[in-house]
């Protein structure tokens, strides 16, 4: 950090969308000297409208605007990971990886270089200081809460981040944009899904992989009996029911994917239930608040399945998660995030 650092300065990640636009307004209202930065992570067909929107907003607010091209890094660390995980028969979580290992670390790095203490985004999350550590907590809008994706942030980031959107609903954010005359931002549609893969991921894999990388294979039941042909194992995920292309007059789900044999195992829903799992690449904000406790909630999908659990550290440096009730469709590669009430305690990647 340069000696010129100032606690009233903030570097704001700006996508040109509604959330980061209102975040800039709110930070200015709070007395911060804002600098906007737009990361060039991925551009579909050279679409740079988001850059122009962010630049125009900064010009209107009379704040500096920077762009930072990280497309090569994003390709190597996020997109290639996404493709490789599906080719390994896993279910990837690119937004978790991007936030914890790319976006927020980049904000810190550039802030340090510029002598700016704070950095911020338009994420719908909050922050709280508990027992000597900062923690991410859920945003007040349950439909927009993004805390699930931020379990891996270290203290050096948590202690300097600003989160102006955490106490607002999306409806109120749109109202603020309209009230302040930022009508384009107020009416922008929310981005859905993975930023670089807005279409079905299967189409994306076909586009990105060499011809012949994905070949037809076979569905089997749990007893090893052949059921039908499938289009290629990367096109299926654990727990999937729709889109299998078969009619057995009963509900069947993907239970297991065997990449080496291009096999997909199908079963009934009950067979997908598990009462334990292991995590790698984990991060815990404060081990004293998480390990060996019986009041921890684990979530394995964004805004979906949650259950009480007990978490223990294993000799091989993995986390063992004992579920108090079964969960279905626990898939390798997915993220698991730990909570107590609204506080994020950590998380990891399911093995």
Curated annotation (Swiss-Prot):
The gene is mnmA2. Disulfide bonds join 98-195. It is found in: Cytoplasm. GO terms for molecular function: ATP binding; tRNA binding; tRNA-uridine 2-sulfurtransferase activity. One of its GO terms (cellular component) is cytoplasm. Catalyzes the 2-thiolation of uridine at the wobble position (U34) of tRNA, leading to the formation of s(2)U34. The lineage of its organism: Bacteria, Pseudomonadati, Bacteroidota, Bacteroidia, Bacteroidales. It comes from Phocaeicola vulgatus (strain ATCC 8482 / DSM 1447 / JCM 5826 / CCUG 4940 / NBRC 14291 / NCTC 11154). Residues 144-146, 301-302 are annotated as: Interaction with tRNA. The record marks 123, 334 as: Interaction with tRNA. Belongs to the MnmA/TRMU family. It catalyses: S-sulfanyl-L-cysteinyl-[protein] + uridine(34) in tRNA + AH2 + ATP = 2-thiouridine(34) in tRNA + L-cysteinyl-[protein] + A + AMP + diphosphate + H(+). InterPro entries: MnmA-like, MnmA-like_C, MnmA-like_central, MnmA-like_central_sf, Rossmann-like_a/b/a_fold. It comes from the Bacteria. The active site is at 98 (nucleophile), 195 (cysteine persulfide intermediate). This is tRNA-specific 2-thiouridylase MnmA 2. HAMAP family: tRNA_thiouridyl_MnmA (MF_00144). Keywords: ATP-binding, Cytoplasm, Disulfide bond, Nucleotide-binding, RNA-binding, Transferase, tRNA processing, tRNA-binding. Its EC number is 2.8.1.13. GO terms for biological process: tRNA wobble position uridine thiolation. ATP binds at residues 13-20, 39, 122.
